[in-house]
Amino acid sequence: MHTSSFEKIRAFRDAYLEPSPNVVLSVLDVGSLAHEEQDTYRPLFAGVRYSYTGLDIAEGPNVDLVPRDAFDWREVPSRSVDVVISGQAFEHNPYFWITLAEVARVLVPGGLTAIVAPGGGAVHRYPFDCWRFYPDAWPAACGYVGLELLEHAMEQRPADPRMTGFDWHDNLMVARAPVFTDGTEEEAHYARLAAIVATRAAMPVSGTDVRTGPALSLYEQRRTTICPEVRPEAVNPTKDWMRAMVADARTRAASVVHRSR
């Protein structure tokens, strides 16, 4: 795990989680498997104030629970977890929106989730690499599963040059599970989550970097001889627009000079 991801979850913990001495917060880490002796979030939730459980689709270091169905965690009761965290996992998840629906289901009313996922970076399969998360990703995803998005941002510059992982342009989001006062609305919410989970399919087979067919083959043959951007019918309208923009700018500048006199 890169240090900037670790520090984002640490900041989430310090900003949002203030358990009282008599309350133990349950923490579920989705995608917790430690690859090649990587660091994990577990140390952030050690001690008597937290009860940490690492969930992943495969057994291994830092994994406490492997659900029988990767997208339907029947081993985790609904409304049973105070905090769900995840880092460097959602980009590998072929159906991340289903997993987010499960996050919403297992959270207690008012429970919190913090997820770190990249907005850039190279292909890295564990065993898949499906997605990147841009600034509009989390508002759309949280709205889909009924979570209240509290904050989100994609990292555009290093917060500290000593940290590793800036090249992933991580996107951190913090969201809260809804608290219902109307039983009908609550029932509809959980029914919708169940319907989303029911759309899951079998885990796909990992693909190759390129699966070439007739369209890509034809493109490869043509790309050195045809460039739509330099064809006259594509370029001329752009030239006209640029000329008009420059002429307008000159007119505005002349008007400003005239008024200043």
List PLM regions with ranges.
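Short N-terminal micro-motifs specific to bacterial/archaeal maturation
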Residues: 3, 67, 72, 87-90, ...
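Class I SAM-dependent methyltransferase Rossmann-like catalytic core
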Residues: 1-21
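S-adenosyl-L-methionine-dependent methyltransferase catalytic module, highlighting the catalytic core
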Residues: 94-244, 254
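Low-complexity, charge- and small-residue-enriched intrinsically disordered regions
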Residues: 248-261
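Conserved SAM-binding loop
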Residues: 25-123, 136-139
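N-terminal short leaders/motifs
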Residues: 8-11, 85-90, 125-129
